[in-house]
Amino acid sequence: MQFEVEIKVMPLKELLDPQGKTVEHSLATLGFNATQIRIGKHISLKIEAESKEAAFANAEEACKKLLHNPVMEYFEINVL
C-alpha cells in the first residue's frame, strides 16, 4: 500500500531561531502582534509499505538518517 506522510521539522525549543526572530521583528514593524515565531520545514511524501506502522517506521528512519539534524531540530511524523 502507499501511504501519504507529512513530516514537520522544527528547531529545538531551547535554541534561538534567528529566522523566526527576523520574521517576528519584521511583522512587528508592519504592525502585526505576533510572538514566539519558529520557522521550520514541512515535508510531504508517499511511502510504499505493508502497514501504517511500517510507513511510520520508514519515515522515522529517513528523518534520523537525512531529514533532520538532531543537534538543532526535532521532527513529528503524521501518516495519513
Where are these regions (language model features)?
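Long, contiguous binding/interaction regions
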Residues: 2-42, 46, 51-80
